[in-house]
Amino acid sequence: MSVYKYYDLIKKPIITEKTTSISEQNKYTFYVNKFAKKLTIKKAIEAIFKVKVKKVNILNIQGKKKRFKGIIGTQINQKKAIVTLEKDHNIDYAGGIK
């Protein structure tokens, strides 16, 4: 698979207070495509960020029910991946930002 297809797999990193605190343990969190498997997520992270992945955990997040002007709808379902890296590797999210 080319690197461009991997960019379709990994949607965006999740940057919150909680994910920042677990990044000290070499764990990084991403929203991924809902059809992605653990092995393809591992290959995508290794190809995009050039790091060595130790483990991948996946969570399926059910969309919440919301009401807007009396109409009940739901938010989209999402898939979250928590990626654990090897000891000497890390990911710099703001590497290209100046």
Curated annotation (Swiss-Prot):
Which PANTHER family has this protein been placed in? 60S RIBOSOMAL PROTEIN L23A
Give the originating organism: Rickettsia typhi (strain ATCC VR-144 / Wilmington)
Q: Which key words tag this protein in UniProt?
A: Ribonucleoprotein, Ribosomal protein, RNA-binding, rRNA-binding
State how it assembles: Part of the 50S ribosomal subunit. Contacts protein L29, and trigger factor when it is bound to the ribosome.
Keyword field contains Ribosomal protein: yes
Pfam short name (any one): Ribosomal_L23
The task this protein performs is described as: One of the early assembly proteins it binds 23S rRNA. One of the proteins that surrounds the polypeptide exit tunnel on the outside of the ribosome. Forms the main docking site for trigger factor binding to the ribosome.
Gene encoding it? Answer: rplW
Q: Which Gene3D superfamilies match?
A: 3.30.70.330
**Annotated GO MF terms:** rRNA binding; structural constituent of ribosome
Biological process annotations from GO: translation
**Full protein name:** Large ribosomal subunit protein uL23
